[in-house]
């Protein structure tokens, strides 16, 4: 089970004060444990891509992070730049305010701006920031992500008021159906919580506690 879970983990370091030495360590751990990817801020994509060259570990980065309040054009440029630097997966934050305003056209256009640039080059995961949404908004966000061509929906940035819950994961899985990925992130710190997310329907886990999870320990990070 540990090895299977390792292949579902995006080994994550998104804090503002991350140093090169920490990114190097992250990549070494990802190689050692066989994680699906490392998830790093855009400034570290080229470094991580170089460190992981010739391995199965992908480089994942974040777009419009963590607020999602950039314009679609900005998110599209961030995506293009990240892919050019070696990103194979991008986790973008939706325009949460637009969703709450009922401006579904803008939400969809915003996601599509990233999807269009990434098509055939990188997987797109759409962060809905579930902790800020009502049930109806969570469903609508997932529906818009699917409509815009996303590969995954993702619960949280890990930088807002809450992280992943099995209930949100189950709702997201029910909404998107079997063919779209669901990523649980934020507060997944041990094997028990990781397994709960997977049982609820998650196919990827975003966490900075990947090593603790596969070693059966508990970490104390929020992401």
Curated annotation (Swiss-Prot):
Stored InterPro entries: Aldolase_TIM, DeoC, DeoC/FbaB/LacD_aldolase, DeoC_typeI
Chief subcellular location: cytoplasm
Record's keyword terms, sorted: Cytoplasm, Lyase, Schiff base
Its EC number(s): 4.1.2.4
GO cellular component term, pick one: cytoplasm
Active site: 91 (proton donor/acceptor), 154 (schiff-base intermediate with acetaldehyde), 183 (proton donor/acceptor)
Any one Gene Ontology BP term: deoxyribonucleotide catabolic process
SMART domains hit by this protein: DeoC (SM01133)
Reaction(s) the record says it catalyses: 2-deoxy-D-ribose 5-phosphate = D-glyceraldehyde 3-phosphate + acetaldehyde
UniProt cross-references to HAMAP family, sorted A to Z: DeoC_type1
PANTHER family per record: DEOXYRIBOSE-PHOSPHATE ALDOLASE (PTHR10889:SF1)
Family, similarity comment: Belongs to the DeoC/FbaB aldolase family. DeoC type 1 subfamily.
Protein name, UniProt field: Deoxyribose-phosphate aldolase
The species this protein was found in: Geobacillus sp. (strain WCH70)
High-level lineage: Bacteria, Bacillati, Bacillota, Bacilli, Bacillales
């Amino acid at each position: 089970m540990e090895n299977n879970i390792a292949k579902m983990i995006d080994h994550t370091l998104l804090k503002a004060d991350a140093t090169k030495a920490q990114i190097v360590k992250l990549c070494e751990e990802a190689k050692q444990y066989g994680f699906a990817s490392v998830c790093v801020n855009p400034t570290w994509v080229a470094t991580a891509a170089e460190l992981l060259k010739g391995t199965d570990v992908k480089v994942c980065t974040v777009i419009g992070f963590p607020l999602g309040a950039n314009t679609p054009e900005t998110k599209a440029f961030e995506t293009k730049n990240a892919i050019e630097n070696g990103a194979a997966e991008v986790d973008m934050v939706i325009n949460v305010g637009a969703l709450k305003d009922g401006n579904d056209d803008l939400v969809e256009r915003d996601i599509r701006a990233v999807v269009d640039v990434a098509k055939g080059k990188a997987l797109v995961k759409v962060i809905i920031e579930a902790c800020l949404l009502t049930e109806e908004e969570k469903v609508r966000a997932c529906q818009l992500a699917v409509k815009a061509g996303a590969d995954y929906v993702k619960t949280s940035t890990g930088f807002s008021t809450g992280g992943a819950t099995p209930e949100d994961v189950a709702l997201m899985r029910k909404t998107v159906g079997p063919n779209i990925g669901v990523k649980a992130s934020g507060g997944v710190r041990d094997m028990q919580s990781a397994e709960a997310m997977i049982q609820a329907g998650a196919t990827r886990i975003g966490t900075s506690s990947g090593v603790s999870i596969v070693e059966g320990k508990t970490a104390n990070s929020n992401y």
